[in-house]
């Protein structure tokens, strides 16, 4: 247990669980890591980490390659599938994402938000989709909302207090490749998103990649998630980028809103 948390009136925390989560996060972030690398990165002794790894291996949470590198184990596959499949947004939204990918011929995403980051629940590839490491990173690594069109569309419609809290946590110019230079510049973008109903990412994160995102909203200020379309700049330009695709993205988001409301 964490005695300091108890003394401060906070819920008690089991330190061993927190340590295990740190180890799992490190393996995920590095896409494989050695015992020595874990010892360098974490504030734990080599012997302690070795004990954790032996336990995690025993239950299938981690696996060890022949060269000694630890990877996440197959234990996560059914667990993550269950977590995703049990959400109403995934169950009621994926059909519309498939339709959107067919209509636009590009890659469509269904995302939700957790702790100020976007999580990809579902991805559908259109006939002109280009599979890239970018899409893989989107699925595997939750990113701060301001770094993508889908994320900005969520951020724009969050309650003002929470939106301002998330903006205050951004280290502008250091933690992402987006060219948004200041909190005020981001606020101006988000005001435009609220006015037009959708957000764009015009090569802000990846050179040559454009995307359009629209929020999935409820009756109140709640934002369930967002819909987005992503494509190479040469395949998403002019009339498509200015009106046709945004209209389809907003339509898909609205249909999912209706399905969530009437489920």
From Swiss-Prot:
State the InterPro entries in the record.
GAF-like_dom_sf, HTH_MetabolicPath_Reg, Tscrpt_reg_IclR_C, Tscrpt_reg_IclR_N, WH-like_DNA-bd_sf, WH_DNA-bd_sf
Segments forming a coiled coil: none
Any one Gene Ontology molecular-function term assigned to this protein's record: DNA binding
Q: Which PANTHER family match?
A: HELIX-TURN-HELIX TRANSCRIPTIONAL REGULATOR, ICLR FAMILY, HTH-TYPE TRANSCRIPTIONAL REGULATOR RV1719
What protein is this chain from? Probable HTH-type transcriptional regulator ArcR
Gene3D superfamilies assigned to the protein according to its UniProt record, in alphabetical order: 3.30.450.40, Winged helix-like DNA-binding domain superfamily/Winged helix DNA-binding domain (1.10.10.10)
Keyword Transcription assigned? yes
State the function annotated in the UniProt record: Probably regulates transcription of the arcABC operon.
Q: Explain what induces or represses this protein's expression.
A: No induction in fermentatively grown cells.
All copies of the IclR-ED domain together span: 89-262
Q: Name the SUPFAM superfamilies for this protein.
A: GAF domain-like, Winged helix' DNA-binding domain
According to the UniProt record, which residues make up the DNA-binding region?
Answer: 35-54
Pfam families found in the cross-reference section: HTH_IclR, IclR_C
Instruction: List this protein's GO terms for biological process.
Output: arginine metabolic process; negative regulation of DNA-templated transcription
List each copy of the HTH iclR-type domain by range: 14-74
Q: Which UniProt keywords apply?
A: Arginine metabolism, DNA-binding, Plasmid, Transcription, Transcription regulation
**Lineage per the UniProt record:** Archaea, Methanobacteriati, Methanobacteriota, Stenosarchaea group, Halobacteria
Can you list the disulfide-bonded cysteine pairs? none
């Amino acid at each position: 247990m964490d005695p300091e948390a108890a003394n401060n009136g906070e819920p008690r925390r089991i330190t061993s669980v927190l340590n295990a989560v740190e180890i799992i996060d490190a393996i995920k972030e590095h896409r494989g890591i050695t015992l020595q690398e874990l010892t360098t990165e974490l504030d734990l002794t080599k012997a302690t980490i070795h004990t954790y790894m032996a336990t995690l291996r025993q239950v299938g949470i981690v696996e060890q390659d022949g060269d000694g590198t630890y990877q996440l184990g197959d234990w996560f596959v059914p667990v993550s599938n269950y977590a995703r499949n049990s959400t109403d947004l995934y169950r009621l939204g994926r059909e519309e994402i498939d339709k959107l990918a067919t209509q636009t011929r590009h890659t469509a995403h269904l995302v939700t938000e957790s702790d100020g980051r976007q999580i990809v629940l579902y991805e559908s590839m259109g006939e002109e989709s280009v599979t890239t490491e970018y899409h893989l990173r989107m699925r595997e690594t939750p990113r701060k909302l301001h770094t993508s069109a889908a994320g900005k569309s969520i951020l724009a419609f969050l309650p003002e207090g929470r939106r301002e809290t998330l903006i205050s946590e951004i280290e502008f110019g250091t933690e992402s490749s987006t060219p948004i230079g200041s909190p005020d510049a981001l606020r101006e973008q988000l005001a435009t998103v609220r006015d037009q109903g959708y957000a764009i990412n015009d090569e802000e994160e990846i050179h040559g990649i454009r995307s359009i995102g629209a929020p999935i909203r409820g009756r109140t200020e709640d934002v369930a998630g967002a819909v987005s379309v992503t494509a190479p700049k040469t395949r998403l330009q002019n009339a498509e980028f200015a009106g046709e695709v945004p209209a389809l993205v907003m339509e898909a988001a609205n249909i999912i809103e209706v399905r969530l409301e009437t489920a």
